[in-house]
């Protein structure tokens, strides 16, 4: 059995803590380790192969770093240039396995879910394996114990041909209003759709080809044109851009006659909103969850998350307060489903706070935006030992670098020289330059940018050891590409 970890997401539902370039699976929300790390760690047991991770190519270095931090392994990373939902991601993985002669069971799991009961998960997997070995397509359903409006539902029915404890999927139901959700819980036989699946690779491809041939055909061509190594699959941007955007549920599971459901009673949560995160965290005697430097007075059932500043609250009930360095979000706990719409509104306004935190992680290290004005920006840059930035040029800004600690190797046009603590240099506009850390300790510098445009997209790369490049134009038809 091969786990396939889907590590996509737009970072919108737990904004401002999650961002597009650092979505929630890479955050430590329910303990010391991140949701991504917890997902992989719960799959380390006998009979389970090392996983395949599917992620956005901009996240691949975060994935590698979080794997290394916990000494975790994955057999391959499949990198998408942009999201096309779950059906193409799983199809490409299944095709890759079948092409390699490994037509095995695929356990498809989101990277950002919480499962508290490991033994219950393994029992559900054992039952699901029996069904999947018979050619069934298994969906793990969480028994609906309360009228939850944030989940999709599955209506099940008995089928004597299935193993005991497994039921046939009768109907998929979109996220209901509260009245319908109450009816579902009262009537019984309804499950929350966990988004977790088990099926054989060839079975999924057979059903996908039957029910959504456009996705199937585009994925075949995408994989043929992708760059594959022993460790990674880098999808062809132009071909993948033509792939329809669809989920496993819509593309296959709602149409196939082989969909069945296995109950999963394992303390599952998709941590899909701030109310869900409040529910899975430890609380004080008044039902409050607090993180960071927080002082709570005369308040009940609140979620207060501080990230640097002192946050004090008085007389609040069922309120969520989330503070980060560059944004604050305050909402009633019953209204947190609206955070996604708020992020959409901010995106329409061109707000950068939805994309990145002030501290941004790169394969070579990180940078933190310290201050910004009309024609200047100040950054604190940290470069890992032995790492280097790309050989690059900016068309609209100059840069001043001041070394705070460590040693910097600077390339500026034809000149290459070293800087040590308290030394500085100037990088003129349109100069070809690079920063490298040749030392054994992190390199810390202060960068002062000045110019008419300071966006991160003002960059022309000439050499980059991490293989970063500008995305290709999208929207060309797959028929055109195939010619």
Swiss-Prot record:
Catalysed reaction equations from the record: D-mannose 6-phosphate = D-fructose 6-phosphate; alpha-D-mannose 1-phosphate + GTP + H(+) = GDP-alpha-D-mannose + diphosphate
UniProt KW Isomerase keyword: yes
Cofactor note: Co(2+) (for PMI).
Any single GO BP term: alginic acid biosynthetic process
Pathway named in the protein's UniProt entry: Nucleotide-sugar biosynthesis; GDP-alpha-D-mannose biosynthesis; GDP-alpha-D-mannose from alpha-D-mannose 1-phosphate (GTP route): step 1/1; Nucleotide-sugar biosynthesis; GDP-alpha-D-mannose biosynthesis; alpha-D-mannose 1-phosphate from D-fructose 6-phosphate: step 1/2
Gene Ontology terms, MF aspect: GTP binding; mannose-1-phosphate guanylyltransferase (GTP) activity; mannose-6-phosphate isomerase activity
Highest rank taxon of the organism: Bacteria
EC number, UniProt record: 5.3.1.8, 2.7.7.13
Gene3D superfamilies, A to Z: Jelly Rolls, Spore Coat Polysaccharide Biosynthesis Protein SpsA, Chain A
Needed cofactors: Co(2+)
One matching Pfam family: NTP_transferase
Record function comment: Produces a precursor for alginate polymerization. The alginate layer provides a protective barrier against host immune defenses and antibiotics.
Stated family: Belongs to the mannose-6-phosphate isomerase type 2 family.
Subunit structure as annotated in this protein's UniProt entry: Monomer.
Protein name as it appears in the record: Alginate biosynthesis protein AlgA
């Amino acid at each position: 059995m091969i786990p396939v970890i889907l590590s996509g997401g737009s970072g919108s539902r737990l904004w401002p803590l999650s961002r597009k370039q650092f979505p929630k699976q890479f955050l430590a929300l329910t303990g010391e380790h991140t949701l991504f790390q917890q997902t992989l760690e719960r799959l380390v047991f006998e009979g389970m192969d090392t996983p395949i991770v599917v992620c956005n190519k901009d996240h691949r270095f975060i994935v590698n770093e979080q794997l290394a931090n916990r000494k975790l392994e994955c057999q391959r990373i499949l990198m998408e240039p942009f999201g096309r939902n779950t059906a193409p991601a799983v199809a490409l993985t299944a095709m890759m396995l079948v092409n390699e002669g490994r037509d095995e069971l695929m356990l498809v799991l989101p990277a950002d879910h919480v499962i508290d009961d490991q033994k219950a998960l393994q029992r559900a997997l054992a039952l699901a394996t029996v069904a999947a070995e018979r050619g069934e397509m298994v969906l793990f359903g969480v028994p609906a114990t309360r009228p939850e409006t944030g989940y999709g539902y599955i209506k099940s029915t008995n089928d004597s041909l299935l193993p005991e404890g497994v039921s046939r999927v009768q109907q998929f139901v979109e996220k209901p209003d509260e009245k319908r959700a109450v009816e579902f819980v009262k009537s019984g036989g309804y499950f929350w759709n966990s988004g977790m699946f088990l099926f054989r690779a060839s079975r999924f491809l057979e059903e996908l080809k039957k029910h959504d041939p456009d996705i199937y055909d585009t994925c075949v061509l995408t994989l043929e044109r992708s760059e594959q190594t022993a460790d990674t699959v880098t999808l062809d941007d132009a071909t993948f851009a033509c792939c329809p955007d669809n989920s496993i549920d819509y593309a296959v599971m709602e149409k196939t006659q082989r969909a069945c459901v296995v109950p999963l009673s394992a303390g599952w949560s998709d941590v899909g909103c701030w109310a869900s995160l409040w529910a899975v965290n430890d609380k004080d005697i008044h039902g409050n969850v607090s993180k960071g430097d927080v002082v709570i007075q005369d308040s009940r059932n609140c979620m207060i998350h501080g990230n640097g500043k002192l946050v004090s609250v008085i007389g609040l009930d069922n309120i969520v307060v989330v503070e980060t360095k560059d944004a604050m979000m305050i909402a009633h706990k019953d209204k947190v489903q609206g955070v996604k719409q708020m992020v959409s509104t901010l995106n329409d306004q061109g707000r950068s706070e939805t994309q990145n935190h002030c501290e941004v992680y790169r394969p070579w290290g990180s940078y933190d935006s310290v201050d910004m004005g009309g024609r200047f920006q100040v950054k604190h840059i940290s470069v890992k030992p032995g790492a280097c930035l790309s050989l690059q040029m900016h068309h609209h800004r100059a840069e001043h670098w001041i070394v705070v600690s460590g040693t910097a190797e600077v390339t500026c046009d034809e000149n290459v020289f070293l800087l040590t603590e308290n030394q500085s240099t100037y990088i003129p506009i349109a100069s070809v330059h690079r920063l490298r850390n040749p030392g054994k300790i992190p390199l810390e510098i202060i960068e002062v940018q000045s110019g008419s445009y300071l966006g991160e997209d003002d960059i022309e790369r000439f050499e980059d050891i991490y293989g970063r490049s500008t995305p290709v134009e999208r929207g060309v038809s797959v028929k055109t590409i195939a010619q």
